[in-house]
Amino acid sequence: MHIPNICSIFAADLKMQCHFGHADSIMQNTEIERKFLVTSEAFIAQATESKEIIQGYLCKEPGKTVRVRIQGDKAFLTIKSSLLRKGIAKFEWEKEIDPSDAKELLQLCLPGAIIKTRYIIPTKDERQRKWEVDVFHGHKQGLVLAEIELESEDEPFERPAWLGEEVTGQPQYYNANM
């Protein structure tokens, strides 16, 4: 069975929405996050919630991905691209979808679904940001990564004691490459 290049289909659809003025807010979605290895399990005591995640990729090409994610009782379709932004900023478009549709889409994904537990740890600053710490299972068992989303690339933030080496921008730590 031939499955058309899903990245090209989504890119064409997004371009069409922009042309007809339906995607004004879509093009303004920018994600700026920093990613780190985690050196201890001390973060677990600080977590305010955790959730199980399974995700797969319909498309993984240099600079762009299309991801399906089931997170608890919710599901999302996400398009990410570094081709429209500079530095560590990425274009991100996310849409909540029906979980039963997501389960079907996961069957169409490329091999190597990611299964992980995500812990949410609030920061102690006035900006009320949060750390997302992912503990990977399955073929990436033992890998633990922490991410924080920022408003600008040079925005300062407090580094928790359990934070290790920064791996932002290192392709081997992109979920799409695992």
Task: Provide a role label for each language-model segment.
Residues A23-M178:
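Phosphate-end processing signature that detects enzymes handling 5′-triphosphorylated RNA
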Residues P4, C18, N29-I32:
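Short, basic/polar N-terminal leader/transit segment immediately after the initiator methionine
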